[in-house]
């Protein structure tokens, strides 16, 4: 997991897509959430940033599950596992898309740490949650995020399970339409309205 993006990129700086109104944050181990994040980024032409654990997860599935259980137990005690990703400022973003895998019903631990660390900076932002899972629901993880980021507002969520991943493109497009998120809205300054007057007629053109 982890994708093809340049690992040398400063983790404090989102990878620019359009530097507009939207930011896609994601963590992913098997690649499902990453594919969702990339689809959203490509549709909106927006910035994207991977939230990475300080220590990479084991390639062995059972080893990863054991570590996930340990980290979830630690979080319940208020101890968040270290990550190497941070964002200085969310000031330019209207919607922050937050993507994660669901582990044992909970949000993947790297993203829990990120939101815990950035809760005050996300106050007042709209957060759009999307997640992937084998079969688990999303509701418990939504409750976790609402507790972590109590100052934010939340949109409708998107969950893809192993049985619906093949519908990813259509599901994401429908979801983004529901949110009113589009490439055009991400770059509102790219449209220019020009009034053209000919005699007593005035025509407004969008360029």
Task: Label each region the model flagged.
Residues 191-193:
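Short loop/turn and low-complexity linker motifs enriched in small/turn-promoting residues
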Residues 6-23, 27-54, 67-188:
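FMN-binding flavodoxin-like domain, especially the glycine-rich phosphate-binding loop
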């Amino acid at each position: 997991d982890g994708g093809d993006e340049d690992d040398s990129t400063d983790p404090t700086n989102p990878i620019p897509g359009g530097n507009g109104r939207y930011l896609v944050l994601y963590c992913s181990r098997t690649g499902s959430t990453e594919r969702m994040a990339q689809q959203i980024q490509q549709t909106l032409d927006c910035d994207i940033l991977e939230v990475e654990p300080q220590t990479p997860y084991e390639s062995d599935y059972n080893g990863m599950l054991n570590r996930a259980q340990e980290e979830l137990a630690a979080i319940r005690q208020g101890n968040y596992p270290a990550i190497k990703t941070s964002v200085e400022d969310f000031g330019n973003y209207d919607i922050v898309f937050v993507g994660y895998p669901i582990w044992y019903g909970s949000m993947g631990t790297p993203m829990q740490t990120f939101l815990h660390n950035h809760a005050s900076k996300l106050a007042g932002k709209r957060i759009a949650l999307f997640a992937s899972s084998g079969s688990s629901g999303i509701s418990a993880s939504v409750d976790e995020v609402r507790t972590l980021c109590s100052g934010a507002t939340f949109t409708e969520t998107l969950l893809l399970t192993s049985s619906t991943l093949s519908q990813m493109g259509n599901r994401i497009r429908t979801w983004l339409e529901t949110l009113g998120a589009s490439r055009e809205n991400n770059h509102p300054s790219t449209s220019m309205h020009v009034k053209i007057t000919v005699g007593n007629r005035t025509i407004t053109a969008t360029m």
